[in-house]
Design a protein with these regions (language model features):
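Hydrophobic h-region of N-terminal signal peptides that target proteins for export
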Residues: 9-18
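Extracellular/lumenal carbohydrate-interaction signature centered on repeated Trp-anchored short motifs
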Residues: 75-86, 160-163, 184
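Extracellular beta-strand ligand-recognition surfaces/modules
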Residues: 108-113, 149-150, 155-159, 163-203
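Short carbohydrate-recognition loop motifs
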Residues: 48-71
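Extracellular ligand-binding interfaces
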Residues: 93-162, 202-207
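Sec-dependent signal peptide recognition
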Residues: 2-10
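Extracellular carbohydrate-recognition regions
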Residues: 20-43
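Extracellular beta-strand elements of beta-rich domains used
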Residues: 28, 191, 209-213
Length: 216
């Protein structure tokens, strides 16, 4: 299966929650989830099951991917000159130990967030950075997708040192697009969440919370 299909065939709705220094991307409510319409990735046997929950820090999205792949996405304009930092709080309850994530057969992640920049007339020409919660690699590692050089996998968290616990991470998306794609990006066009296990045929359980962009 082509990873470009995974990234760019997601269902997007347009929305924008913003303040001077922060842009919130997802609300993680039942109403929002119903609007996003989970769509199965072409070639996957099943859809990832997404559901809404809550804890003392607010709402979260739970994903269960059992030999499955589907994603949630939003078209949202992010001014990377004002708010270049993506902030993600997430947790992995069941990971994908033993897979080789930089190969086609092992290119699955219990949790990932795509930052997408439109760079052409068609979705297949877009560029993406795939911020991942790895099951096997160290934080700070990165590599081109085994399916396309237009997407780069960048490990922000790893179950090697953060398993079954909430962890918050941050990355400068503007600098990342320059580093990985040699692009000077002033505005981001979309963000997508996906938990997928269709290549490895395994099962993962993950949680997402508080995904937003900030000035610092």
């Amino acid at each position: 299966m082509k990873i470009l299909v995974k990234i760019f065939a997601l269902v997007f709705i347009s929305i924008n929650f913003s303040s001077a220094n922060e842009v919130k991307v997802f609300e993680f409510t039942e109403s929002e989830l119903s609007q996003l319409q989970v769509r199965k990735v072409r070639g996957a046997d099943k859809k990832t099951v997404y559901s809404i929950g809550a804890n003392e820090n607010g709402n979260y999205l739970k994903s269960v991917a059992d030999n499955a792949a589907s994603g949630l996405g939003k078209e949202i304009k992010i001014d990377l000159n004002k708010t270049p930092f993506i902030n993600i709080t997430w947790k992995i309850e069941q990971d994908l130990k033993g897979i080789k994530e930089n190969t086609k057969k092992g290119h699955d992640f219990a949790a990932r967030v795509f930052a997408v920049k439109k760079t052409g007339a068609t979705p297949l020409s877009n560029r993406a950075i795939n911020y991942v919660f790895s099951s096997n690699n160290d934080v700070g590692l990165n590599w081109p997708s085994p399916y396309t050089k237009k997407s780069v996998d960048n490990v922000l968290s790893s179950t090697k040192n953060s398993f079954s616990e909430w962890v918050t991470v941050k990355s400068n998306v503007k600098e990342d697009f320059k580093k990985f794609h040699d692009l000077d990006v002033n505005e981001l066009d979309g963000l997508a969440i996906m938990s997928d296990t269709d290549n490895s045929k395994m099962k993962s359980i993950a949680y997402y919370q508080n995904i937003y962009f900030s000035a610092e």
